[in-house]
Structure formats: structure tokens, C-alpha cells
């Protein structure tokens, strides 16, 4: 029995964390999952013990040396390779359902579009790190940069979040293009939380039933 792999993507402040918590409660009672399957919740970066150390290197905001853009890309790839091999693929092989807060699309959006790194290189690294594993469904929570900045006003920012509006605009453009080219399911994240929940449930019922 093979499980299902669900990914939520979107710019900072789009509400992924809130919606994932809802899906953790909703999925086991949705009628979608087979009997005996569990829901595994994870994230990138930082879904494994090794990944948590990598996450600290990637996102810290101290005065320590920050990773150069290419080094940053390699760290994300290392995190993903460990994540897929030690957590995601074993869970799917057990028949469990995996929900991940971000996956390879975020690397293309943030490092490819945001940083301007070679997207062909990023896609080659993606193939290596994932060993060909792809989500069964990617749910893109679409949010404007203006709304993202407003929602996060006053919040403590990590190193990536602190990049500013111009960087985030490029990232948002990247997500939009990826959603089109990879047939992601787009959900407007500027609605009420309950409306977003209902839209996500509809997408999952439609695509995974």
C-alpha cells in the first residue's frame, strides 16, 4: 500500500501552518484515507534531526556568517535529500499520508526566482535530492506581497523573511509560474480562514478521492 504526499506552498504569511493544523484533524475523518493509515506532518527545511541543524544554518539572523546563495541552495538540497530518504518515502511506503509545509517548489521560487540562481541547476538538484519523488497534490496558497507584509508586521523575521518586498515579489512571481507549469491547485489565501479550509478540503476531495 502506498500513501499520499500532500504539499502546501506559498509566500510567507499565507497561512500554511494554520491550514496544515486543520488538515491534520480533518483528513483522518474525511473518508479519503484507508483504514490504518496515519497522517505524518513535516516541513522544509527541518523535517528531520539533521534537517533541523540545516534549518538553523539557513534561517538564523545572528551576526554569524550567512550562507552564500549557492551554498544556501546546496543546504536546501541536502535537507531535502535527507527528508525524502529518511522520513517521506518510508512513511509513504508504510501507507501513511504525508503533509509537508514546503517542498521543492519553494526552492525554485525562493532561490531560482528570488535569488536569481540558475533554474536548470536547481531542477537538476531537485531530481537528485528527491530521487524522482513528487507530491500527489500541491496546494498553493496564493497571497499578494502587500497582504503578506501586512500580516507579518511586527513579527520576528528569519533571514529569508527579512529580504524585503522586492525579493518577495520575485518569489511570488515564481510561485505563480510554477503553479501554472506544474498544475498546482491554487487557493486564494486572502479569504477568511474558514473559507480557505473549505477550499482546501474541496481540492483534496476532488483530486485524492
Curated annotation (Swiss-Prot):
Its EC number is 2.7.4.9. GO terms for molecular function: ATP binding; dTMP kinase activity. The keyword Transmembrane does not apply. GO terms for cellular component: cytosol. GO terms for biological process: dTDP biosynthetic process; dTTP biosynthetic process; dUDP biosynthetic process. ATP binds at residues 10-17. Pfam families: Thymidylate_kin (PF02223). InterPro entries: P-loop_NTPase (IPR027417), Thymidylate_kin-like_dom (IPR039430), Thymidylate_kin_CS (IPR018095), Thymidylate_kinase (IPR018094). It is an enzyme of class 2 (transferase). It catalyses: dTMP + ATP = dTDP + ADP. Keywords: ATP-binding, Kinase, Nucleotide biosynthesis, Nucleotide-binding, Transferase. PROSITE patterns: THYMIDYLATE_KINASE. Belongs to the thymidylate kinase family. PANTHER family: THYMIDYLATE KINASE, UMP-CMP KINASE 2, MITOCHONDRIAL. Phosphorylation of dTMP to form dTDP in both de novo and salvage pathways of dTTP synthesis. This is Thymidylate kinase. It comes from Synechococcus sp. (strain CC9605).
Amino acid at each position: 500500500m502506498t500513501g499520499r504526499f500532500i504539499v502546501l506552498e506559498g509566500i510567507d504569511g499565507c497561512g500554511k501552518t494554520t491550514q496544515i493544523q486543520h488538515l491534520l484533524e480533518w483528513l483522518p475523518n474525511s473518508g479519503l484515507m484507508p483504514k490504518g493509515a496515519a497522517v505524518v506532518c513535516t516541513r522544509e527545511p527541518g523535517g528531520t534531526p539533521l534537517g533541523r541543524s540545516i534549518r538553523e544554518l539557513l534561517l538564523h539572523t545572528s551576526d554569524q556568517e550567512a550562507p552564500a546563495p549557492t551554498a544556501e541552495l546546496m543546504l536546501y538540497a541536502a535537507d531535502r535529500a535527507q527528508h525524502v530518504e529518511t522520513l517521506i518515502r518510508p512513511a509513504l511506503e508504510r501507507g501513511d499520508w504525508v503533509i509537508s509545509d514546503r517542498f521543492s517548489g519553494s526552492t525554485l521560487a525562493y532561490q531560482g526566482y528570488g535569488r536569481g540562481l540558475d533554474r536548470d541547476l536547481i531542477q537538476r538538484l531537485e531530481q537528485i535530492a528527491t530521487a524522482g519523488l513528487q507530491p500527489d497534490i500541491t496546494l498553493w496558497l496564493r497571497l499578494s506581497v502587500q497582504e503578506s507584509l501586512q500580516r507579518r508586521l511586527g513579527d520576528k523575521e528569519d533571514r529569508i523573511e527579512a529580504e524585503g518586498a522586492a525579493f518577495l515579489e520575485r518569489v511570488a512571481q515564481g510561485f505563480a509560474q510554477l503553479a501554472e507549469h506544474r498544475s498546482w491547485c491554487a487557493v486564494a489565501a486572502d479569504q477568511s480562514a474558514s473559507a480557505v479550509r473549505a477550499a482546501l478540503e474541496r481540492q483534496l476531495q476532488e483530486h485524492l478521492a
